[in-house]
Amino acid sequence: MTTSSYFLLVALGLLLYVFQSSFGGEHVCWLGDPNHPQGICGPQVADIVEIRCEEKEAEQGGANNARANTGRTSSLMKRRGFLSLLKKRGKRDEGSPLQRSGRGIVCECCKHHCTKEEFTEYCH
């Protein structure tokens, strides 16, 4: 393989990598990245995920009567569980000596702007 062919192959590989990382739908964040002006952060994240998950459940056949009778208690338990999961992930990442990238909900929706579909991906 000639030098120019090798250079062209490397250049195409880099171009493909840049294209995929820019338009692939996955966000990558680094410590110290600023929040997106339209990003949703803090307790609002749990509220939006809860709403999106309830909408998704309704679209897939709706909630049963037992869940409807429990009302907000069930929603509160889901929110607490979700916030607990976020705290555990945060604590796990705090101990890392490296400033590694993140691809969680904070990266997706606070550091960047989430669509409704991206919030729905966090439903269990």
UniProtKB/Swiss-Prot annotation:
It holds the Pfam family Insulin. Disulfide bonds join 29-107, 41-110, 53-123, 109-114. The modification 4-carboxyglutamate is found at residue 118. The modification 4-hydroxyproline is found at residue 34. It comes from the Eukaryota. It is found in: Secreted. The keyword Secreted applies. One of its GO terms (molecular function) is hormone activity. Belongs to the insulin family. This is Con-Ins Tx1. The lineage of its organism: Eukaryota, Metazoa, Spiralia, Lophotrochozoa, Mollusca.
